[in-house]
From Swiss-Prot:
PANTHER family: RIBOSOMAL PROTEIN S15, BACTERIAL AND ORGANELLAR, SMALL RIBOSOMAL SUBUNIT PROTEIN US15M. One of its GO terms (biological process) is translation. One of the primary rRNA binding proteins, it binds directly to 16S rRNA where it helps nucleate assembly of the platform of the 30S subunit by binding and bridging several RNA helices of the 16S rRNA. Forms an intersubunit bridge (bridge B4) with the 23S rRNA of the 50S subunit in the ribosome. The keyword rRNA-binding applies. The keyword Translocase does not apply. Keywords: Ribonucleoprotein, Ribosomal protein, RNA-binding, rRNA-binding. This is Small ribosomal subunit protein uS15. Belongs to the universal ribosomal protein uS15 family. It holds the Pfam family Ribosomal_S15. Residues 1-19 have a biased composition (Basic and acidic residues). Part of the 30S ribosomal subunit. Forms a bridge to the 50S subunit in the 70S ribosome, contacting the 23S rRNA. One of its GO terms (cellular component) is cytosolic small ribosomal subunit. Gene3D superfamilies: 6.10.250.3130, S15/NS1, RNA-binding.
Length: 87
């Protein structure tokens, strides 16, 4: 993910100007990285080091989502819908 894409995601999901650390921003950035790594692993099936990284990122995102669900269910529902994480 290049710097411009990262800035775009941060601006889109930020709660206020200069927000880089809110759960929504972190979840959006992790989702982008997960999607990119997923496409990489479809082509390189035996890349187990990257697969482990993917699983760690998914776990980290899950933790952030759980935190957001506990703290503010409306923000949780909004980010889920926006990123299309649930069926």
């Amino acid at each position: 993910m290049d710097k411009a894409k990262k800035q775009e995601l941060m601006a889109k999901h930020a709660r206020h100007e200069g927000d880089t650390g809110s759960p929504e921003v972190q979840i959006a950035l992790l989702t982008e990285r997960i999607n990119h790594l997923n496409s990489h692993l479809k082509e390189h099936k035996k890349d187990h080091h990257s697969r482990r990284g993917l699983l760690m990122m998914v776990g980290k995102r899950r933790g952030l989502l759980n935190y957001l669900m506990r703290e503010d269910i409306e923000r949780y529902r909004a980010i889920i819908k926006e990123l299309g994480l649930r069926k």
